[in-house]
Every structure is written in structure tokens, then in C-alpha cells.
A protein has these predicted regions:
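Ligand/cofactor-recognition surfaces for anionic moieties
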Residues: 1-449
Length: 449
């Protein structure tokens, strides 16, 4: 770590003290709180303030460890982040001892990723830049995001004087900083550049999608449960669990940006998808095919054996299947069919074409450069779109699950069989980027026809 990471507690504590005193000036001014009462309350909140500050000191090194773990996979996006910061006049590589483009090209050739101190610099600049972008947007004004104030301040003040938070004169700044820090801590330094390059979305839209994914999937509680495994399971395994949540986060942010209207506020979107995702999770036992059920049981057993509590292990073992949950909710919305029927049909279609094997293998495809990464993400998105559209037309026939797939296949057997065999061959022959693109094209053509 850099000194800025290891010694951030002092700055955080000072900021918290100032913001607490500003908040308490409201009840102090209207007579609900005396000066002695204010001082007593500040003293009472000392431990809570310390815990909140230490929490930030926990999350920043964790963000760096996750970025380190990604290694060369994220190299292109990290280089793009540097270039973007330079163009905006926010970063001087020489001042921050960051490599120039020629040095980065040599590092790429040698497969040498960014060092931890370099990632720490990028983390700081990513947060500062995102904070600026969010303050210039309407994101901090979304009523749903007022809950970020409750995450920032100690519970005592949030419970006793909620209006002091709502009318805090730095309300927008605190929301923007709290949300932006959460985004970079959980998504990595190159989060904004990565998602923007894949979708063309502005930072404000990415922030809204981040909040929607985080809260729809209950990721805060999930990450907190993983935090509780400190010194109970091997550190490497714990980092793998955080990375699994991060993978889901990054993937579904893109999905929400492409498939959900976030312009009318987050409250209804989060409520709808949170309930829908919970319904999909509840339906998994009856919707997944035997191979998927066996793989899920094996994942859970392995985690429990390593020391992960059974309930948490079960939730984590569901994540690969829950990646599809927003697609299933969307198909249910468009067809009017129950979540359970749509889930069964969606997974049956995936099993018929072996799409689960393809999407799983896609994460292991070697990526040579930044453009390979974009091509991979585009192909995966195309396959996801095809699977969603297949499920919609299949479930529309009145059946569900394997029966719905069979009913849809029957009148178009020859064409479907040709595509199915080709996709199976791709799934069984060692997946490459070009093969993934071919599979995406075949499935896309099938849906169009």
C-alpha cells in the first residue's frame, strides 16, 4: 500500500467530525439539543465513528487486492484510465511515478501487471474524478440515494435526528462521495472506464446502475457476511468469494444499463428487481437441471468444508445461476408468465443448447489486449440476449421448462438441430474468442428466424 492508503484514517476522522458538527447544528439551533447534549452525543458516538473510519481502511486495501488479483485481465482498462485522467488534466504520470505508454507496452509484452502502489494511485484518482462527475449530475438528488447518508453517519444521529441528515448543507457532497467510494471500492479503479467503453454510458448512469445492482442482489449484506470470515477461512479463498460478487456486479451493471430505464429514479427499479431476483433464487431447486444442481451442491460442499457457514455457502453457490435472474425477471415482465415458469424455461433452453457451459468457459478465454476484452463482453452479451429471447418465445407457447423447449423445437426441428449441434461442438472443443463470436451469431440468427 501507499502511505495515503495506510494513513487515511486521520483524514477520514477529521471529515467525519466536521460533518457531524454541521449535522448537529440543526437540532442545536432549534433547541432540541443543548451544547452539553451535543458534546455528550459526540462522545457517545466515538466508537461508532472509529468503526466507520476503520471500515474505510478495510475496504481500500481490499479493493487493491481484488485489482491485483485480476492482473493482466484489467491491464487494458487501467491503461485507459490513465489516459482518460491525463486528457481531463487530472493526472501527471511523472509526478505520480506512473509508467509512460512505451513502458506499459513493454510490461504488456512481459505480462507484468500494475504494482500495488500504482493501483493505489489509480484508486485515489478514480474516486476524486468520479466524485466530481457525480456532483455535476442529478444522481445525488435521487431520493432513493438518501440512504447513503445513513451509511455514512453513526446510527445514533441517524435515528435521533434524521432531519439533520436530510437537511445537511453538504448532503449532495456526502452522497456523491459515499456512493462513488463504494463504486470504486467494490468495482475497482477502472470501473467507470471499463463500463463506459462497453456501453457508452456516462458516469452518472453507471452510478445509478451500480446502486440498482448492489441493492437488487443484496450485495452489501453478502459482502458483509464475507467480511465476517476474516481469520476463519484462508485469505485466498476469502478473496475469491469477494471476486465472485465483484464479477456479478460488473456483469450486471452492464445489463441494467442496456435493459432497464433508470432515468425515472431508483426506488421502483430496485424494489421490482430485488423481489424478482429473490423469487428466482427461491425457484432454483425446481428450475435447474440435474447437472446444474449437482455443480451447485458441489460448490456449496466445498465452501462448507473450507469453513464457510452453510447459509452463506448456499447463497454464494447460487451466484452463477443468479446471474440470469434479471433476464428471467425481464422475460416474466414481457410475457406475463410466473417467475417460476420462466426460470424453468430459461434454464431448460440453456441446457438444450449447452449455453451454461459456454458462458462458464467464456470467463477463462485468454485475453490478449483491451479490444479482445471488449469483443468478449460483446459476444457474451449477444448470447445472453439470444437466450432471453428464446425463453420468451418458448414460454409463450403455454408450457414451461423442458416441455416448452420441446414444443418450440418441434415445428422447426431441422434448423434448430443444425444450430444446436454447431453450438455443442463449440462448447466441447475448447472455447476461443472467435468460437464464442460464432456461437453468438448462430443463436442470434436462430432467434431472428
Amino acid at each position: 500500500n501507499t502511505d495515503a492508503i495506510d494513513n487515511s484514517a486521520g483524514v477520514n476522522t477529521s471529515d467525519m467530525e466536521v460533518n457531524l458538527k454541521i449535522a448537529l447544528s440543526i437540532p442545536l439551533r432549534d433547541g432540541r439539543l443543548t451544547m452539553d447534549g451535543r458534546n455528550a452525543l459526540l462522545a457517545e458516538m466515538t466508537d461508532d465513528v472509529a468503526a466507520l473510519v476503520l471500515r474505510n481502511n478495510y475496504l481500500q486495501p481490499l479493493a487493491l487486492s481484488l485489482a491485483e488479483r485480476r492482473g493482466m485481465e484489467a491491464f487494458g482498462f487501467q491503461q485507459r484510465l490513465i489516459q482518460t485522467l491525463e486528457k481531463r488534466g487530472h493526472l501527471d504520470r511523472a509526478v505520480e511515478f506512473l509508467p509512460d505508454d512505451a513502458q506499459l507496452a513493454e510490461r504488456r509484452r512481459r505480462a507484468e501487471p500494475f504494482t500495488r502502489p500504482e493501483l493505489a494511485v489509480l484508486l485515489a484518482y478514480a474516486k476524486l474524478t468520479l466524485d466530481e462527475d457525480l456532483l455535476e449530475s442529478a444522481v445525488p438528488d435521487d431520493p432513493y440515494l438518501a440512504r447513503e447518508l445513513g451509511r455514512y453517519f453513526p446510527k445514533a444521529i441517524a435515528e435521533r435526528f434524521p432531519d439533520a441528515l436530510e437537511h445537511h448543507r453538504l448532503r449532495r457532497e456526502i452522497i456523491a462521495t459515499q456512493l462513488g467510494n463504494s463504486m470504486i471500492n467494490r468495482g475497482g479503479p477502472s470501473l467507470i472506464v471499463r463500463i463506459a467503453d462497453q456501453t457508452g454510458a456516462a458516469p452518472a448512469a453507471i452510478a445509478a446502475a451500480f446502486a440498482a445492482v448492489r441493492d437488487s442482489f443484496g450485495m452489501t449484506a453478502l459482502n458483509t457476511a464475507i467480511d465476517g470470515l476474516d481469520n476463519r477461512i484462508p485469505g485466498k479463498l476469502q478473496l475469491e468469494l469477494y471476486a465472485a460478487v465483484q464479477d456479478l456486479l460488473l456483469d450486471r451493471i452492464i445489463w441494467f444499463l442496456r435493459n432497464v430505464d433508470l432515468s425515472k429514479g431508483l426506488a421502483d427499479v430496485v424494489a421490482h428487481y430485488r423481489d424478482g431476483i429473490a423469487a428466482v433464487e427461491a425457484a432454483l431447486d425446481g428450475a435447474l437441471f440435474e447437472d446444474s444442481l449437482s455443480a451447485r451442491a458441489a460448490r456449496k460442499a466445498k465452501l462448507v468444508e473450507a469453513g464457510v457457514p452453510a447459509e452463506l455457502a448456499g447463497r454464494l453457490s447460487n451466484l452463477p445461476s443468479l446471474t440470469a435472474a434479471p433476464d428471467i425477471v425481464l422475460v416474466a415482465d414481457r410475457t406475463g408468465k410466473p417467475i417460476g415458469e420462466v426460470a424453468a424455461t430459461y434454464f431448460a433452453a440453456g441446457a438444450f443448447f449447452r449455453l451454461d457451459r459456454i458462458t462458464s468457459a467464456a470467463s477463462n478465454i485468454p485475453i490478449a489486449d483491451y479490444f479482445d476484452r471488449l469483443a468478449l463482453d460483446r459476444a457474451r452479451d449477444s448470447i445472453g440476449d439470444a437466450e432471453r429471447r428464446l425463453a420468451a418465445v418458448m414460454v409463450g407457447n403455454g408450457a414451461a421448462g423442458a416441455a416448452a423447449v420441446a414444443a418450440w423445437v418441434k415445428p422447426r426441428h431441422d434448423e434448430v438441430e443444425r444450430v444446436r449441434l454447431a453450438v455443442h461442438e463449440i462448447a466441447n472443443s475448447g472455447l476461443t474468442l472467435s468460437k464464442l463470436a460464432v456461437a453468438a451469431s448462430l443463436l442470434g440468427d436462430l432467434v431472428k428466424n
